Amino acid sequence: MNPIDTDDLEKHTPMMRQYLTMKAEHHDMLLFYRMGDFYELFYDDAKRASELLGISLTARGKSGGDPIPMAGIPYHAVEGYLAKLVQIGQSVAICEQIGDPATSKGPVERKVVRIVTPGTLTDEALLQERQDNLLAAVYQGKVGFGYATLDVSSGRFVIAELETKESLEAELQRTNPVEILYSEDFGAMELLHHFKGKRRRPEWEFDYDTSIKLLLAQFGTKDLHGFGITDARLSLQAAGCLMQYVKDTQRTALPHINAITRFNQTDTIVLDAATRRNLELTQNLSGGRDNTLAAVLDNTATAMGSRMLQRWIHQPLRDHAQIFARQTAVNELLETTAHESLHEQLKALGDIERIMARLALRTARPRDFARLRQALNLLPKLQQSLAQLSAPHTVKLGQLLGEFPEEQQLLERAIVDNPPMLIRDGGVIREGYNAELDEWRGLSEGATDYLVQLEAREKERTGIATLKVGYNRVHGYYIEVSRLQSQQVPLNYQRRQTLKNMERYITPELKEYEEKVLSSQGKALALEKQLWDELFDLILPKLHELQAFARAAAELDVLSNFAERAETLGYTCPELSSEIGVKIEAGRHPVVERVSQTPFIANPVTLYNQRRMLIVTGPNMGGKSTYMRQVALITLMAHIGCFVPADRAIIGPIDRIFTRIGASDDLASGRSTFMVEMTETANILHNATAQSLVLMDEIGRGTSTYDGLSLAWSAAEYLAQQVGAMTLFATHYFELTQLPELMAGVYNVHLDAIEHEDTIAFMHAVQEGAASKSYGLQVAALAGVPARVIKAAKHKLHQLESRDHQVEGVNVNGTRAPIQTLLALPEPVENPAVSKLKAINPDNLTPKQALDLLYELKRLS
C-alpha cells in the first residue's frame, strides 16, 4: 500500500488516518511517529528504516484490510538512529504527541515538531564538531550558475556567482555540502552525482522576486545594498530557495541568520577541484582526514577554530595586507609565548558558535547554557591576556570579544552548576533564583521526611514491624505489608496493588498528601519550564554580539595554533614580495615530513621572470611528485598567514594554483584516465596566467609515445612561451630536457639516485640539470616484479641497445635521442580522393559529370 494515498482514509482506523494524513504532508522523508515510548514507522518507511538501520520489521495488525509493516525505535535512543540516517543523506520528520492521552477522545493529538535533514542539523550529538555542516542550493541560469551555502549551526550565509561548470565544481569541492538543493531544470547533474543529500526542488522556489522578499524579511532590511549583493541575481535565487527550505524544516524564527556575504574568487587564490583533491588539503584521496594538510596544521583548542582553519586552507588570500596582519599577530604570539596561555584559555571556551545557533533556534539544552556561562566567566581573563599584546589584528580581535557581565551574572544566578541533559527532567534552575519555584520544590522535596515519619507512625499504630511506605511512578504512594500480615491492617487501609507476597494500600491521609505533592511537582516543572523559556528572551538580545565573540575567539584560536605549529614543527615566516616569483630555501613537504620514518630531505626551488619553468626529471619513487606538491603547499600556507616548512621563503603574487598530478578513471562520467588527464590539462592551458603556479606531472601517459611526447612538448612550450606561468613540469620523456636549449626561461632540475649492482638508492635531493636515466627496471624489481620477468626484460634491453634501436622514437636505454628525429615527423599527405572531393563544386556539375566523378573517386580511394 502507498502510505501517501489519502483517498480511502475511511477504510483505516482513526490512528492510522492520523498517520497517513501526516505522512502525505511529508512524503519525501521518513516519518518518526511517536507512540508512547517508541517512534514507530509504517509501510514503506518501516521497510526502508529496517534496511538502513538494521532494526526488526514486524506487522501491526491490519488497517484497511491489509497487514501494516511496522518498525520501532525507543525514544531515548532516537539521536543515535538519527545520526546514522543523516550520515547517509536521509531526512526525518519527528512527530510528537502534544495532547494528553488521559483526556483525549480518539487518537492523541500529534504534530510534526521537528524536521531533521543532513544540512539543517544543530544538535550537538548529530554534528561532526570539527567540520562545517553546509546546506547548499544551486541554480542554473542561461549563462552561469548561482550558488548559496548556509551553515544553520552557525548562521554563516554565503553566495557566489559562477560563470562555468568548472568554477561550480571547484566551489562544490571547496564547500563540500552535506545536502544540496537544485532546480528541476538543473543541467549539470554530473557534478552532483557523488553527493548523498540531493534534493530536487520545484522551479518556482527559485523565483527571483520571492527570494528577495524572503531575504529582506529575514534580515529586517528595506533592500540588500548594504550587503553588496544586488547584482548577484542567480545566487540570490539560490539563496531564496535555501532560505525557504530552512524555514520549512526548522519551523521557528532564525535570528542567528542575520547577514549574507558574497564570495569573490578575485579575493582568493583560485584552486580548482582537481587541485584541492590532488593536494589533499582537508580530505585525502580515500575520503578521510589522515595525512592531509589540515591534519598537520590543526592543533586548535576549539572546534570552531578547527572549522575556521579548514575554511582558511580552502580560501588562501591574495591581499598581502591581510596576510601580513595575520603574520604579525602570529609572530607576536610566538615571540611572547602568549600562544601557550591562550591555547589553554581557549580550550575551556567550548563551541560557542554552535551554542549560539541553538540558543537562536531555542533548541539549546541546559548544558549549553552552562557552557556559555563558563565561556563568559573566562572572558575577563582572556581579555587580560590580550591586553599584553600590541599587534593591530590581535587588538582588533580583543575588541570584538566584547563584554557580557549582565549575561554572565544572569546565568550564574539561574543555572545550577551541573545541570541535567534536558529541561523536562527539572533541576535546572538554581535555588534562590525564583521564590515561587523554591516554594513548590520545598513541598515536593519535603516528601521524603514526611514518608519516614508516616512509616514510623503507622508501624507503631498497627504493630506491623515490616510495614514500609514507598512510591513508584505507576501507582504513586503506597503502604506495603506482607500478605501474611495483611489481616492486621486498619479499616482505613484501601488496597491499591496486590503482589505475589505483598499487599499495597493507601489511606485517605496518604492520598491527600500524594495529590498535594504531585501537584507541587507538576507546578514546579511547569514554572521551571517557563523560567527556562524566559532565559532565552533575556540572552537573545545580545545574540549578534555573542556571535561576534565566537568568531573572534575562533580566529584567535587559529592564529595561536599557527604560532604553536611554527614552534613545534620548525616553521619560518614567509616573506611576501610584489615581484612575481617563488623562492624557497630548504623547503619540506609539511605532511610527508610528519609521517616519514626517515629524515626528510629539504629541497630548494627558484622561479622568477627569467626562470619560469623547471623540467623535473628523475626515477619513479625519486620524489618528483612530493617535491612539486611541497612547493604548492608552502605557497598556499604562506597565503593563509601560516608559517612554512622552509629555512626561507619569498613568495610573489599568485592568482591560481593548478595541479595535474595523478589520475584515475572517472567511471561516473564515463571518462578514461587519459581523458581525465587531458581535461585537467586543457583547464590549465585555458586559465593559467603569468601569476599562476602550475604543477604538471607525467603529461602524455596513456597513449602512444609519439602522441604523449608531442602533447607533453606542446603543453610545456605553450606554458613557457604563451602563458609564462611559474611551472614545475615533471616528465619521463627525456627529450623534454632539451627545451632549455630552445626556449628562454626553461631550466632542468632532477632528483638523483645511486645504482649499486642490482639495487638503487633514491637520494631525494633536487639538483640542477637533467637526469641521466630512469632506472625503470630497478624500480620494477623493488615493486616485486618476479625476478624471472626482470631478467627477461634486461635481456631484451641489451638486445635493443645493441641494435641502437628506438621504440616509437624513444631510446630504450633512457638516453636522449636527437630532438629533430623525434619531433620532425613528416607532414601527413592528403588522400588524392579527398583532394579531388574538395575541388568539386556540386552546383556546376551535370548528372553525367557527377556520375563520372563518382567512378573517379572510387578509383582514387
Swiss-Prot record:
One of its GO terms (biological process) is mismatch repair. This is DNA mismatch repair protein MutS. ATP binds at residues 618-625. CDD domains: ABC_MutS1. HAMAP family: MutS. SUPFAM superfamilies: DNA repair protein MutS, domain I, DNA repair protein MutS, domain II, DNA repair protein MutS, domain III, P-loop containing nucleoside triphosphate hydrolases. PANTHER family: DNA MISMATCH REPAIR PROTEIN MSH1, MITOCHONDRIAL (PTHR11361:SF34), DNA MISMATCH REPAIR PROTEIN MUTS FAMILY MEMBER (PTHR11361). It comes from Shewanella sp. (strain MR-4). It comes from the Bacteria.
